[in-house]
């Protein structure tokens, strides 16, 4: 469960906007996170990332099978994020 507030701003080279929703789970090693990025131009993107000791980690997202249930539980609190993720498996 993330302690970071949403929405909060982000600024990338190709656009800026807000992190509209976020689902994460704390593990012994890092905090796997899925974010809904809502750009100022109205477009939306998913970001699969991780945090380490509270800081954004520049590494690929790796989620152990034993943490998927907890991450799924957190995703239930983020309806827009779930809607986009369903497009990956439907």
Question: Where are the regions that the model predicts?
Answer:
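Intrinsically disordered, low-complexity regions
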Residues: 16-18, 43, 55, 65
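Mixed-charge, Lys/Arg-enriched low-complexity segments
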Residues: 2-3, 7-10, 52-90
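Intrinsically disordered, low-complexity segments enriched in small/polar residues
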Residues: 13-15, 40, 62
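Compositionally biased, intrinsically disordered low-complexity segments
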Residues: 21-22, 37, 66
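A short, structured beta-strand/loop element
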Residues: 28-59
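Negatively charged, low-complexity tracts enriched in Asp/Glu with abundant Ser/Thr
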Residues: 1-29
